[in-house]
Amino acid sequence: MTFVVAAVVLLTVVPLATPLKCVQCDGPLTEFDCKTTVPEAKDCPQLNTHCFRNDTFNSKNELIMVRRGCTNEKEPSPPCQEVGNGGRRCTYTCNSDGCNNAPGFAIAIEPSRMVIFIVTFSVMISFILHTSAN
């Protein structure tokens, strides 16, 4: 039983070996406009732990360019910054496969990590209850 608990805890702590997959496109520099048409998510370089979406707005608050890709930054600070002539650039990050693919961006929780956490927590509670009963 101790081995099972140790194995589950180890799986929770050690990151999975598969690389993160993010949508990667650069607005007008690719065949996809990155706003409404995006390519399939691709593997990120090993050190990149998050996906990003970078939106650039003009002074009329119109979305003029979108970039999407991989990064090792969790959250930009601040998320939005002023850029020339009253425009702004906002960067959003997330950490699950393909989470930066939506036209409107939403932060996603990696489901596999949540399942591992729930299983680990359940096994630990069962172990504690079992040992305290004896």
UniProtKB/Swiss-Prot annotation:
Primary subcellular site in the record, as a coarse category: secreted
Tissues expressing the protein: Expressed by the venom gland.
Signal peptide extent: 1-19
Subcellular location: Secreted
Family: Belongs to the scoloptoxin-05 family.
Miscellaneous remark of the record: The scoloptoxin-05 family has remarkable similarities with the three-finger toxin family commonly found in snakes.
Gene Ontology MF terms: toxin activity
Keywords, sorted A to Z: Disulfide bond, Secreted, Signal, Toxin
InterPro entries per record: Snake_toxin-like_sf (IPR045860)
Cellular component GO terms held in the UniProt record: extracellular region
Name under which the protein is recorded: U-scoloptoxin(05)-Er2a
UniProt keyword Disulfide bond present: yes
Source species: Ethmostigmus rubripes
Domain of life: Eukaryota
Changes after translation: Contains 5 disulfide bonds.
Signal in keyword set: yes
